[in-house]
């Protein structure tokens, strides 16, 4: 499937649509009734919307309008060479919600999609009803504990700061397989179709580069004015309902990384641990994650 766009357009109980937002075009997978409450799903690295394939039909069957979008730089969405800051990507999500005609949405994010979910109530409060975050500490908490992240995570973040060599490894040296395997719980047999889909999506033009740019911004921006402004904004309290879930066998984000999250939430906060799962929660624990999301959604006013 290398370089084959069909991996992005996989068929299922959903429809594919391009949605304009923030001066760009985004590929969004939609399911559920048009008048249902909107739930936006944001994937992590090195994935695309397909990471949510198990949850999309479950949430839609429960009456929600589900939008699983490819984040800027991934999948079928636009891949500009620059402009991959967290505030920009957060504005992308806000624009998609507006373009879909919904007043507000519950934003669910995994991995760095979770960092965007955390950012939504602060940077896009008018369209954010609630959030759910999987495997992602609050951005300020993450900065505080970055030295206590696992050696695996620190090594990856350091290596991708070098230009071009990580891109080549993603395209040609099977780095995608290694990342997916490392992010899974120890001993997990990663389904071959999962590896094949993510390798194919990473081999699409420009994706190996643009998919890394947000991760690079997170590191490089911390001493710069744009990064300091973002972190200052994220110090404001979050008042919308929050669900935070982590995997009990997550080798990338240890439990200590989440310890300060409650300091940033001044509204309802529920935390949960999926004991047998690693970092790839939507795929390692599809039923458990669907149930947790449905429980969270059911509590919202």
Region spans (language model):
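Conserved HGGG/HGGXW glycine-rich cap/lid loop of the alpha/beta-hydrolase fold
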Residues: 30-76
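Flexible "cap/lid" subdomain of the alpha/beta-hydrolase fold that forms the substrate-access gate
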Residues: 2-17, 24-31, 67, 74-108, ...
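Charged catalytic carboxylate motif
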Residues: 51, 92, 210, 288, ...
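Short, hydrophobic alpha-helix immediately C-terminal to the catalytic nucleophile
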Residues: 53, 118-122, 290
